Amino acid sequence: MVRVTFSTEQKVKEYSGKVTGFDILQPDALKEVVALKVNGELYDLSREIEADAEIEVIQLSDEVGLDIIRHDAAHIMAQAVKELFPNTQITIGPTIQDGFYYDFATDRTFTTDDLTAIEKKMKEIVKSNHRFVREVWTRKQSVDFFSGIGEKYKVDIISSIPEGENLTVYRQGDFVDLCRGPHSPSTGRVKAFKLMKVAGAYWRGDSKGPMLQRIYGTAWGNKDELNAYLECLKEAEKRDHRKIAKDMDLFHIQEEAVGQVFWHEQGYILYNVLESYIRKKLINNGYFEVKTPILVSKELWERSGHWDKFRENMFIVDESENKKLAIKPMNCPCHVQIFNSHTRSYRDLPIRMAEFGTCHRNESSGSLHGLMRVRGFTQDDAHIFCMEEQVNSETIKFCDLLKEVYSELGFNEISVKFSDRPDIRAGNDEVWDRAEKALLEAVKEAGLSYKLNPGEGAFYGPKLEFVLKDAIGRNWQCGTLQVDFILPERLGAFYIGADGHKHHPVMLHRAILGTFERFIGILIENYAGKFPVWLAPTQLAILTITNEADGYATEISNILKEQGVRVKTDLTNEKISYKIRLHSSNKVPILWIVGKNEVTSKTVSVRNLGSERQESFSLEKANESLLKSINLN
């Protein structure tokens, strides 16, 4: 007897023996269902359920369901490539955000024409509606099969799987691939897909290993979703922060300093405006600011645990007075040193310590991407040292601050990923229970929706990741809050409790922006360079029509500068139409145009970015409107 409980309905069905999803679900429901979750594990609809189970239905409209369809598409692509180019060897084909890829070993260089042919073949395979058939094989069966058909990379993967563990393969028509699954019932479920590009990749990510060709694709639940995504990509290309930054003269990156930013005048103004804004928020919320060294002894990184876990990503200075030093990849161990510089009492807690900390990480050159992925960066980093019973209230305060900052920067759609305890972790379950409960209650009280990432917390504590949605619907994970029970203990941090004894504080690692570099990249793309007036590097440009207006324009400029307005004055002899085009292309939000008439009447002609309309205002009225648009409140 097998008892099946449907988690959403709490409805129980009993069966005389083993059953599958096809047995359990009604035929009409099967059209939208791609898989099941059985006691928390994903199952194909054809996989047998052998014991009592709680069932959750996975539909195509679910995030997990769409991920399964993309996994299907990766297998279909691999089959298409093998049919078109039989000498190609297949390696791995996972899903990624918005799509999938598959790595192929071949002497052939895939072209755009090849992608067209592969896509056509994929459509034929979809039309054939081959069933995805799961089979459990022994290790020997798997090695014999894949070595027999010359798939050496699959044999290599099998060799890394523990001895005695059975393996699963999936068959679709004549094509067989090593795979954990799950898959949808058949290839016909993949309704809307497109191959996007070809890139190089190394086997197992090792630059010393064989070079492979990676084909990227995307797949969606229907053609409307696919077309919407492709339109979003076109819009994203127009908003590429690297292109806009070049047009606006914000920054550049060059080979002599790979992954590090050369901020130009306008870009650094933007950077400083953002930093000043965050600094004010921190001060108003009870933080104090510190500055810690960039070069720190290996000994501290060993004690903190970063040397073992993070050494490959650290820049090492071999010798300095017989000491090995490392450029810091993060600020937290240094902040503990400041905490440890005094004896702390429970009355001092919480301590909110902030730093605009410059860090460096040795990211691979292939992963670098404009401001979005760099080697040298500055974090809006802060650490809150508190007692365990203060975790909830501090998390609520942080969530409120984060929501306020995101909203004022133009992001009102925020979601949260909550990562709870991993299998391997420090601390006892009671401590984890309290920490997880404190975070979840704080998120709910802040009015934020969250998604559970089971087992994805760090070994030293649970984690919140804050995801914002931009103007074209893309999600960006920026803010974080991480509970840490371990680092204060490792580095000897303590406070004197009400009982007169020493206690280790809980440490909350938190950031709102993440890094200034990446967040500025996100801001550029969100606004397409057309920043709100308060944030714009140049808030106003005064353009003269004639030299007779130069003195008036300069006088206005000086008044505005005294008021803190970031203003430029264009007194060149160029035609006014050229000046308007120039400063509009530089995304200056407001233009004041002055000529003989404006000088006489003490007025300005106001033109806003993106509009061809000009309106005449008295200088007093225009100034009042300008200051109002600059003021956040």
Curated annotation (Swiss-Prot):
<keyword id="KW-0694">RNA-binding</keyword>
<dbReference type="InterPro" id="IPR047246">
    <property type="entry name" value="ThrRS_anticodon"/>
</dbReference>
<dbReference type="InterPro" id="IPR012947">
    <property type="entry name" value="tRNA_SAD"/>
</dbReference>
<keyword id="KW-0436">Ligase</keyword>
<dbReference type="InterPro" id="IPR036621">
    <property type="entry name" value="Anticodon-bd_dom_sf"/>
</dbReference>
<keyword id="KW-0030">Aminoacyl-tRNA synthetase</keyword>
<dbReference type="InterPro" id="IPR045864">
    <property type="entry name" value="aa-tRNA-synth_II/BPL/LPL"/>
</dbReference>
<comment type="similarity">
    <text>Belongs to the class-II aminoacyl-tRNA synthetase family.</text>
</comment>
<dbReference type="InterPro" id="IPR002314">
    <property type="entry name" value="aa-tRNA-synt_IIb"/>
</dbReference>
<keyword id="KW-0067">ATP-binding</keyword>
<dbReference type="InterPro" id="IPR004154">
    <property type="entry name" value="Anticodon-bd"/>
</dbReference>
<dbReference type="InterPro" id="IPR012676">
    <property type="entry name" value="TGS-like"/>
</dbReference>
<dbReference type="GO" id="GO:0000049">
    <property type="term" value="F:tRNA binding"/>
</dbReference>
<dbReference type="Pfam" id="PF07973">
    <property type="entry name" value="tRNA_SAD"/>
</dbReference>
<keyword id="KW-0862">Zinc</keyword>
<dbReference type="InterPro" id="IPR002320">
    <property type="entry name" value="Thr-tRNA-ligase_IIa"/>
</dbReference>
<keyword id="KW-0479">Metal-binding</keyword>
<dbReference type="InterPro" id="IPR004095">
    <property type="entry name" value="TGS"/>
</dbReference>
<dbReference type="GO" id="GO:0005737">
    <property type="term" value="C:cytoplasm"/>
</dbReference>
<dbReference type="Pfam" id="PF00587">
    <property type="entry name" value="tRNA-synt_2b"/>
</dbReference>
<keyword id="KW-0820">tRNA-binding</keyword>
<dbReference type="InterPro" id="IPR033728">
    <property type="entry name" value="ThrRS_core"/>
</dbReference>
<dbReference type="GO" id="GO:0004829">
    <property type="term" value="F:threonine-tRNA ligase activity"/>
</dbReference>
<keyword id="KW-0963">Cytoplasm</keyword>
<dbReference type="InterPro" id="IPR018163">
    <property type="entry name" value="Thr/Ala-tRNA-synth_IIc_edit"/>
</dbReference>
<comment type="function">
    <text>Catalyzes the attachment of threonine to tRNA(Thr) in a two-step reaction: L-threonine is first activated by ATP to form Thr-AMP and then transferred to the acceptor end of tRNA(Thr). Also edits incorrectly charged L-seryl-tRNA(Thr).</text>
</comment>
<dbReference type="GO" id="GO:0046872">
    <property type="term" value="F:metal ion binding"/>
</dbReference>
<feature type="binding site">
    <location>
        <position position="509"/>
    </location>
    <ligand>
        <name>Zn(2+)</name>
    </ligand>
</feature>
<feature type="region of interest" description="Catalytic">
    <location>
        <begin position="240"/>
        <end position="532"/>
    </location>
</feature>
<dbReference type="Pfam" id="PF03129">
    <property type="entry name" value="HGTP_anticodon"/>
</dbReference>
<keyword id="KW-0648">Protein biosynthesis</keyword>
<dbReference type="GO" id="GO:0005524">
    <property type="term" value="F:ATP binding"/>
</dbReference>
<keyword id="KW-0547">Nucleotide-binding</keyword>
<comment type="subunit">
    <text>Homodimer.</text>
</comment>
<dbReference type="GO" id="GO:0006435">
    <property type="term" value="P:threonyl-tRNA aminoacylation"/>
</dbReference>
<feature type="domain" description="TGS">
    <location>
        <begin position="1"/>
        <end position="59"/>
    </location>
</feature>
<dbReference type="InterPro" id="IPR006195">
    <property type="entry name" value="aa-tRNA-synth_II"/>
</dbReference>
<protein>
    <recommendedName>
        <fullName>Threonine--tRNA ligase</fullName>
        <ecNumber>6.1.1.3</ecNumber>
    </recommendedName>
</protein>
<feature type="binding site">
    <location>
        <position position="332"/>
    </location>
    <ligand>
        <name>Zn(2+)</name>
    </ligand>
</feature>
<dbReference type="InterPro" id="IPR012675">
    <property type="entry name" value="Beta-grasp_dom_sf"/>
</dbReference>
<feature type="binding site">
    <location>
        <position position="383"/>
    </location>
    <ligand>
        <name>Zn(2+)</name>
    </ligand>
</feature>
